[in-house]
Amino acid sequence: MSATTTPLPKAVIFDAYGTLFDVHSVVAAAEQMFPGHGDALSQLWRQKQIEYTQLRTLADPAGARYQPFWNITLDALRYAARKLGLDLDMPGEKRLMDEYACLSAYPDTVPVLRRLREMRPGGERIGLAILSNGNPQMLDIAVKSAGMTGLFDRVLSVDAVRAYKPAPAAYALGPLAFGATARDIVFVSSNGWDAAGAGWFGYTTFWINRAGAPAEELGVIPHGTGGGMADLLDFIENLAPPDKSPGRSRHSPGG
């Protein structure tokens, strides 16, 4: 884990897809449907999904080109299947979209979220939220199916501003929800571009580099990095004053 000096967080906000939820947990179903192509379909599906969100916001920041994330996810799936020459019929679409609606959580996610809920640095609980490109209905289903009900104070969707990350209007939802400055909130994402966008906006950022990818060449460095949620917990504990919550010892930054 790496870290730089940051203030005590008033809240921790998580990206959802790829950070809490494993977007590639659809591979098994995709591979069963298209043997030998499941991984390629999942990878291209995700790539086009992100591209389409960004293109729609870039084309018209006012939101005229906005489509809900569910629609974009379906469009991206259809493109990926055509690109790979796969015969994806309507029942197949439904099966894969149903899989996407109920993505698996990464194994390290729920235990660390519960630990964060228990923390009382300085006697106050740290607020927890999701800030996601997902539309509200998608997020509600995903949170429930992943066993995360009750772990978040807020589940924030960019649908409220009709602009996808990394648009500033999307990131502004976090400080507004908690009545805090962006600097006083830790924004957590596994997507390097998302961590960079949040950093530009002013958040304290933590990049969960699950894939072991190189840092983005964007001139902005996350305040902390790590390979999983346990590293995030260490990062938060080193920002916070000692509390009386049970469970973990403290470590020095960079340990």
Language-model regions, residue ranges each:
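Short helix-capping segments at alpha-helix termini
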Residues: 34-38, 83-88, 121-123, 147-151, ...
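Asp-based, Mg2+/Mn2+-dependent phosphohydrolase catalytic module
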Residues: 2-9, 131-255
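A metal-dependent, Asp-based hydrolase signature
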Residues: 39, 52-95
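Active-site neighborhood of HAD-like aspartate-dependent phosphohydrolases
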Residues: 2-50
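Hydrophobic side chains within well-formed alpha-helices
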Residues: 26, 41, 92, 148-151
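An amphipathic alpha-helix signature
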Residues: 27, 42, 46, 70, ...
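Intrinsically disordered, low-complexity coil segments
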Residues: 57-65, 117-127, 243-244
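Substrate-recognition element of Asp-dependent hydrolases with the DxDx(T/V) motif
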Residues: 90-102, 109-146, 156-158
